[in-house]
Amino acid sequence: MTEIVDITAREILDSRGNPTVEVDVILEDGAMGRAAVPSGASTGAHEAVEKRDGDKARYLGKGVRQAVDAVNGEIYDALSGSDAEDQRRIDRMLIELDGTPNKSRLGANAILGVSLATAKAAASSSALPLYKYVGGVSARILPVPMMNIINGGAHADNPIDIQEFMILPTGAETFSEALRMGAEIFHALKKQLKDAGHNTNVGDEGGFAPNIGSAEEALAFIVKAGEGAGYRCGEDFHLGLDVASTEFFKNGKYVMEGEGKTVDPAGMVEYLAGLVSKFPIVTIEDGCAEDDFDGWKILTERLGGKVQLVGDDLFVTNPERLAVGIEKGLANSILVKVNQIGTLSETLDAVDMAHRNSYTAVMSHRSGETEDSTIADLSVATNCGQIKTGSLARSDRTAKYNQLLRIEEELGDQAIYAGRRALRAL
């Protein structure tokens, strides 16, 4: 009854107005799963490759008809009749069918759409929500949201070098309370920025993109906004950064144009250590560039004992890259983006490897998102305790938060909000 009888892909739009792939998988018993694939703005060189058409006369070359055709043709032919409940076999077949190390022939966007839609169809057939289907009875930890409320870098048109400034409502008792805290701080920040003469337009991930030049000024605005909303920074909520430093790593130096600094890896670490000494920052993502292993080693030795150091471009959700990082002692956490690796099974393997080696894991969106809320379920299914899915504006971001509210409600007394326990710094 869980045999795949139909697979249909289509081209839809993501939150940036760019095409992406959506896939429907239908089973013999009529159950259906649907998944839409996200896309990143700042992408790691080692990510699985999303397939774009390259036809400049159509969607400026960003169309995904080739990926759609691959799903509706070659992938459908290979998977038709397969058991949707055997996720690992499905994913293995997809990987072997593609035949490349980075999924570039069929496209990670084609492969991931099918992988996730298959899992959702199997969950529907089992009459289970996705988080329970994937995670089983132990899936009951609601994640701490990392809310990106000031945007810079590749996510905004302002001079701020650091890509994301985040709040983490660590002091909340429940996820719903954490979401309320975040929303109240978000609105307090909007008022303070407006009062200071800054624009309050939002960036790709729903955060504000004010025309300020320094990280310290951005962090000070957030601390003040939290106080204005009635919350204590360092007690009720903490701060986080996504430096996205690969974006400004040039010829062995970190060129921070907004800050007016050019530093070597050791200097970059000292710059971040200075911010940590001044503000209650508990998590830093991509503090060094993806292939700057020496910088990562210095950073981990300097701050790894008191700050969560998250590898995004460093690990690209790839168990092989993560294994290298673990061996070399780089970072202490992995950012998990399903489209960086391209299948559900490989995503789960990355989280499992992280947990077995005492690394934390953070489930994450991309800057180009859709209304698909799969990652909300996966954050609970994997008990990773943290989710990064943008600010408190734009429905492509709030869709994930709202799904987590539903999951918390469904779990009832069994629900556990991760809170401070999710972070090694606390």
From Swiss-Prot:
Catalyzes the reversible conversion of 2-phosphoglycerate (2-PG) into phosphoenolpyruvate (PEP). It is essential for the degradation of carbohydrates via glycolysis. GO terms for biological process: glycolytic process. This is Enolase. (2R)-2-phosphoglycerate binds at Q163, K337, R366, S367, K388. It is an enzyme of class 4 (lyase). CDD domains: enolase (cd03313). Mg(2+) binds at D242, E285, D312. Keywords: Cytoplasm, Glycolysis, Lyase, Magnesium, Metal-binding, Secreted. It comes from the Bacteria. Its cofactor is Mg(2+). The keyword Cytoplasm applies. Pathway: Carbohydrate degradation; glycolysis; pyruvate from D-glyceraldehyde 3-phosphate: step 4/5. Belongs to the enolase family. PROSITE patterns: ENOLASE (PS00164). Its EC number is 4.2.1.11. It catalyses: (2R)-2-phosphoglycerate = phosphoenolpyruvate + H2O. The active site is at E205 (proton donor), K337 (proton acceptor). One of its GO terms (cellular component) is phosphopyruvate hydratase complex. GO terms for molecular function: magnesium ion binding; phosphopyruvate hydratase activity.
